[in-house]
Amino acid sequence: MQTVSTEFDTIAAISTPPGEGGISIIRISGVDALKTASQIYRGKDLNKVNSHTINYGHIIDPENGNEVDEVMVSVMRAPHTYTKEDIVEINCHGGIVATNRILQIILGLDARLAKPGEFTERAFLNGRIDLSQAEAVMDLIRAKTDQSMKVALDQLDGNLSHLITNLRQNILDVLAQVEVNIDYPEYDDVETMTARLLKEKAIEVKAKIQQLLSTAKQGKVLRDGLATAIIGHPNVGKSSILNHLLHEDKAIVTDVAGTTRDVIEEYVNVQGVPLKLVDTAGIHETEDKVEKIGVDRSRKALSQADLVILVLDSSVPLRDEDRELLRETNHMQRIVVLNKSDLEVKINLNELQEYVDDKEIIKSSAVSPLGTKDLEDRIAAMFFAGSIENTSNNIMVTNARHIGLLKQADTALDAVLEGIETGMPVDLVQIDMTRTWDLLGEITGDSYQDELLDQLFSQFCLGK
């Protein structure tokens, strides 16, 4: 990671969401940030105020001297800022007109409009954070539960960075020792000694990488949410289950079969587990072209689901479509909900037990929250019981890019161990150890391609 600041041009952007609100914030960063802000600010001389202070004044249109807005202006001087550059943040009244007017005045002076994520990109390029920490900023913004926020904060604080840096240093130390042993052999069995040194370090690093990878499944759930498909025959109460989990009415509920003809997606926090709930159209044979499209989309949602909530109508006997869905989801993470339990039970429970264990079954009612708490408890119990089960000293891997690089590093270490076992020359085995070092460096951004930065930071919003 770079540690020396690079001088860039001055950038500006609105950092708050568009629309009406109490305040809006326009952020300026760069060598001319103070100069630019001073040209449009009436109040204390910003060039003379202390760093990390907030100052009351007004924004003035420099072309005509007219007052634009009453503002509070924060001044933060390099290097102790988010970007390690001078930063000025203008807090104006919320709303589109005033905010955009101030931004346009700034862009007419010594600043240009920032690209998405450019402030965070500068924080990385100027050495304040590494690449994994930069990615954690986006994870923090997108966090859907307290636990996903905690994991993102831990990564932003550098927990993952420190572990990866230590692993790379351990590898570098052993590579240096290998080079010394090869170039200046003091003993006849130097090849054997060096191979043993490489093997011990490869086993040690591999164990720590596998510890990290063991958290990947839970990490993906926390970061991206658990893709949860609510499926079943038309009019079994799928939309009611969705609404009960959301604790509000999002889906249309009627007694008409086929009311849901499309896929409805909503996020909900279930005891710390972020669910991406997908309420699907009823899966059944149909000649209706529009309804058939909905059924096809339902099957696609089912194929992509991490968890399936299969809803059955307990007030009618099992249908052939029910049996098909029970068979189809048998090897998936599944909860079976017997809905309409407030009505007379006509489903054959003995037959149902041929397809599903009792522990998978939850009884519920479409007209009341009956069974909702049981369903939430079951979901939480299936996925780490609402707490972060962690085997890597509170470090969890959540990012698909990091997971992929760790898997590649693990494979490279397999090659190291295989090479040693087969008697491959140490200088050749060393190549795979060096590759492991490089791959781990890609996680923190010690080595990267410009295209990767463009791809990562383009996912950020303007002003961050």
Swiss-Prot record:
SUPFAM superfamilies, A to Z: P-loop containing nucleoside triphosphate hydrolases (SSF52540), TrmE connector domain (SSF116878)
This protein's UniProt keywords: Cytoplasm, GTP-binding, Hydrolase, Magnesium, Metal-binding, Nucleotide-binding, Potassium, tRNA processing
Residues that, per the record, bind K(+): 235, 254, 256, 259
Domain of life, per lineage: Bacteria
Keyword Lyase: no
Binding site for GTP: 235-240, 254-260, 279-282
E.C. number: 3.6.-.-
Example of a GO biological process term: tRNA wobble uridine modification
Binding site for (6S)-5-formyl-5,6,7,8-tetrahydrofolate: 27, 89, 128, 464
Family in the record: Belongs to the TRAFAC class TrmE-Era-EngA-EngB-Septin-like GTPase superfamily. TrmE GTPase family.
Function: Exhibits a very high intrinsic GTPase hydrolysis rate. Involved in the addition of a carboxymethylaminomethyl (cmnm) group at the wobble position (U34) of certain tRNAs, forming tRNA-cmnm(5)s(2)U34.
Subunit structure: Homodimer. Heterotetramer of two MnmE and two MnmG subunits.
UniProt name for this protein: tRNA modification GTPase MnmE
Native source organism of the sequence: Pediococcus pentosaceus (strain ATCC 25745 / CCUG 21536 / LMG 10740 / 183-1w)
